[in-house]
Amino acid sequence: MTIFDNYEVWFVIGSQHLYGPETLRQVTQHAEHVVNALNTEAKLPCKLVLKPLGTTPDEITAICRDANYDDRCAGLVVWLHTFSPAKMWINGLTMLNKPLLQFHTQFNAALPWDSIDMDFMNLNQTAHGGREFGFIGARMRQQHAVVTGHWQDKQAHERIGSWMRQAVSKQDTRHLKVCRFGDNMREVAVTDGDKVAAQIKFGFSVNTWAVGDLVQVVNSISDGDVNALVDEYESCYTMTPATQIHGEKRQNVLEAARIELGMKRFLEQGGFHAFTTTFEDLHGLKQLPGLAVQRLMQQGYGFAGEGDWKTAALLRIMKVMSTGLQGGTSFMEDYTYHFEKGNDLVLGSHMLEVCPSIAVEEKPILDVQHLGIGGKDDPARLIFNTQTGPAIVASLIDLGDRYRLLVNCIDTVKTPHSLLKLPVANALWKAQPDLPTASEAWILAGGAHHTVFSHALNLNDMRQFAEMHDIEITVIDNDTRLPAFKDALRWNEVYYGFRR
């Protein structure tokens, strides 16, 4: 069972009574056939549910109203099978607060050249019925997604499935609670921001809990539960000599397991699916949570360090979007550079907290080593390299009057040398179009040093995310040129200024 099993997408057919009952009967039959086929053959992430035909303003308004109040409904897919006068949709679309996709398709793929007549033409009017629907969306300044293609086309299936992932993630985000253990890292700007504005825009709430509250739960974990979890560690990871039974750091592993169990219990009891920590606020914890955070991220929790609630929420959102896809998604930080003519590289990592979902090793190394930050006992962590191939890094920032999503397309590469003295998980990549352009553009756009790294998602996914939430997106990829990029930032400033 995945998170998508908790949601459904409604399939709505637009028509009218002008064409008579026989035409509407055929429309209904076509709709049933298409929905059944899509649910069976299209490998969609969640179920399509066919709703009654929308043939009058009252029927359409009722469908939209019901969609708003049904928590299982993640969005609407609308098919204008015949011509459906768009004034009938105004009241419904005015109140609709769920994502909307217009499926611009028709029942038949090929025209029946020898038998086509006006009955066929009146029944299959997507070509101009869809344009009428598009006009009212533009007139109402309501942007919605559009997918054109036959309902048996695999590319159409993939695009609808991708949109469904966005719709489910948006609905899930409305219920997302972010827990901050402690506050923001002192004097850091980009990790701070307006939590009220974020809840208005995205729906997730952000609140702070004292680390002492967490410590109480951690200390309540039984030794039996700790030992059972460490047994799981033994089977899942390659334990270094220091972490094995009778090893000099074995107690640190036991303590890391206790922290993991305590954190998970705290998050489950509070209904949290994203959280932050900060090494400046660890009172009562024996070590900075490293292994615990890594494993919780792998289970789908959002996380970011230093109180960075925006990145923690974004990671959770992207975890939901990428559920079931190939490749992992993790908290990340651009840490240091390798400058070499024609081969500039970025080494990404964090103090401890990189998600094992992006690991290339089947069994990462579990080790305990010194950490000079935080002033606590040496923390346990998983150490691994990252899968190679195309990926993205994304950052969500608060500009005061709006949110900006930055996305850099990257290519992860194999680490050319063993990092024998680097005791943390890491990723190595080439930034597109090149490191000077990418880093300068990122800095000019105000991108954070914390990001979400993903092999599972791509630029199109993040474009859909930005469009669905009506936020600015700034893209850095192989097509980026700095003069045009700077112009786009200026134009966006004017555009969003007019929308205030």
Curated annotation (Swiss-Prot):
It holds the Pfam family AraA_central. Keywords: Arabinose catabolism, Carbohydrate metabolism, Isomerase, Manganese, Metal-binding. InterPro entries: Ara_Isoase_C (IPR024664), AraA_central (IPR055390), AraA_N (IPR055389), AraA_N_sf (IPR038583), Fuc/Ara_isomerase_C (IPR004216), Fucose_isomerase_N/cen_sf (IPR009015), Lara_isomerase (IPR003762). GO terms for biological process: L-arabinose catabolic process to xylulose 5-phosphate. Signal peptide: none annotated. Belongs to the arabinose isomerase family. Homohexamer. Catalyzes the conversion of L-arabinose to L-ribulose. This is L-arabinose isomerase. It comes from Shigella boydii serotype 18 (strain CDC 3083-94 / BS512). The gene is araA.
